[in-house]
């Protein structure tokens, strides 16, 4: 190689050294100094792994003093290059810059610069980069983005609500599904969509204290959303890092009590500029016209400041009209400002609901009914639609569906309130109760008697709680030496039940963690029963492992022993046997226990076993729950109301179980109250709202479409390719499970989303649902999204050289494969990727500029090519540099037409879609006041900004591959 002192070269094998300068040479060796690192390298002159750095007219270069030069001309003087051009900071022309004075930290970012500088990537990395571009672009445009990646069953009514609400600007809605229908999952899906699309970045979730960990677990395990839990300690710590502690995290969960308790803390919460606020158990926010509660006022303050609000609440009818109005008032105080007016309005919706019922029944409509429909809809040109709906023509059903849709749009609260009921949703199992009456051991009788004497001053409530758990009373007196499990007949019964049902999975729930731990030891030591334990003292990872062991079919635990708090937020639909070792204090907790198994998607009827001790509070409670509330075999929406009204009497019976006088009357009166309230709820059902919330056929199709996308084999192939190239170890464990672990030779030292000790993954939704320790990999999973970002945000795979063995072409024939990206820059919240995601345009050019890409498909072509090592590649590039420059010029002239077509299509699609949405809502605004002005303004502003951004769209070369034909 011809070396001259002062020339600039770059190392082919150590490009991180930057630009080197020739500082010494003799007949056989050359020495390069790399000023940016201060290191020297000695190379053999004849075959050194270095590439001469030469820039061309049109390039911009940086001097060692930091100023930049746009090159107009390149001269050579005594073997050294001199660049002549315009200095960018002073705009001075004819400025010269000798190559020896170039900035040594020069980074080659353009693919062509990297190629000419000898920074040649492996061929498989180029292929991965192209696939990453192609798949990322496709995924951005796929329908239902944000709904495909969560670890949940594809349940139509949940998907319907999430799809409707998740795409809105700053949604403000009330989610009021009945228990067991998945409000938390619906909220999570909405959050996931909003965060993934960029519509929201900062989210605050406020929940009752007992549900904080449940939400934390659900958001992480189901949606891969890592929330920070703020309590007093965390808040104090964060004060050291920021004036407003809540600005240290993007996603925050805190309790309602924590938010309300301290005035400054509430101010900090209000000032933290959240995009979305989620409030669970919103029915506990007490409001009246004269005296709203402090909790209500705290949430009201936040709701005034946060653009998007999701309130999760029990069914509205359970709580009374005023309570329901109070929640709607939080969502839109301008619209819901007068309670009397609201009550009147609700009455006026009855004809609308009747009209919908009429259409759905499918019967022929009378002239009066047709006229009533016309009046209700109030649209011009509705006559043909009414005639079609009332005919025997093929389009009759479609016309009826359209009329129902038009009525829905005019229905008062359909945009702000969603409520599904078990009556309207199929897929729930039956619940069967099996009570087992057992004698009270003498040891317990003695302990209870002594406790009664010593605790005479205790309140009735405290005595009632004690009487529910006689083993705790006994243990208190006996201390560590007390072995209640040796004589408690419930333990004997449990062991007998488990040994006679060894093939069945059984969930056992008890109130206390200590009880669960003691039972596990007894079952293991006495009968060798495999039992996993699950309690609040365990970390999330430990609970995951316990749940996974329980979920394993053949080698897993037969029984899972849960404490009351430990089981929150976990569902075990694969089991259908529930044993309640004791009973909880109130009907909400009872429903929560049964709800661990009684979820939508449960395949079997649920067998509920309650072994109880006679003459204890358990014997009182089991009768009251079953005979008074029917709470074991059916969900009990009336439970809380009756519990509150019967509380004083019930507590006395629980505190003194032997006093049974009048208990039958209490049960009878509670049952009558239950039946009356239930009938009242049924009568008050809003059928129209249920139809709207349920989604009907549309929701079924949505679930089916996502299920079809689950079968995308491209994902598995791409993910494995990505893991191979990044350097992540993969260990196939069978059962559709793969263990990923970091290796010592990864592309990056710390791959985002991959724990240090690795993780288990699956591509199968069913496996992910039964194995909580396995992460469900989809295109939306952080591992894949981070992998795409890692490849595409850097220069991995952006320049390479390959050989094509093809005797039909002359040896030395050049082809250049160019991958351009057409894109527009815009703030994430505009969601520009719906219309123009970064889109790859592939070209395969010969030296005459003929584009062969349409005839030669990428994957087929890629398989015909072979790799070249970097050193040989650098020599090839130097030999054909001028030809490659010429082909690149031809590519630049051809890309404009393709790019312009893509941009024009995107602009047309965006205008049609956003203008259509705006027109539809503006037309509806006239008949439905629940469409907010700020929502209309946001859509209009969004449309203008999107079109403006698309006008600024451009293109750039993202990757190139030089292909040289050989016959060997």
UniProtKB/Swiss-Prot annotation:
One of its GO terms (biological process) is regulation of DNA-templated transcription. ATP binds at residues 177-184. Keywords: Activator, ATP-binding, DNA-binding, Helicase, Hydrolase, Nucleotide-binding, Transcription, Transcription regulation. Residues 164-334 form the Helicase ATP-binding domain. It comes from the Bacteria. InterPro entries: Helicase_ATP-bd, Helicase_C-like, Helicase_RapA, P-loop_NTPase, RapA_C, SNF2-like_sf, SNF2/RAD54-like_C, SNF2_N. Belongs to the SNF2/RAD54 helicase family. RapA subfamily. Interacts with the RNAP. Has a higher affinity for the core RNAP than for the holoenzyme. Its ATPase activity is stimulated by binding to RNAP. This is RNA polymerase-associated protein RapA. It comes from Salmonella paratyphi B (strain ATCC BAA-1250 / SPB7). The lineage of its organism: Bacteria, Pseudomonadati, Pseudomonadota, Gammaproteobacteria, Enterobacterales.
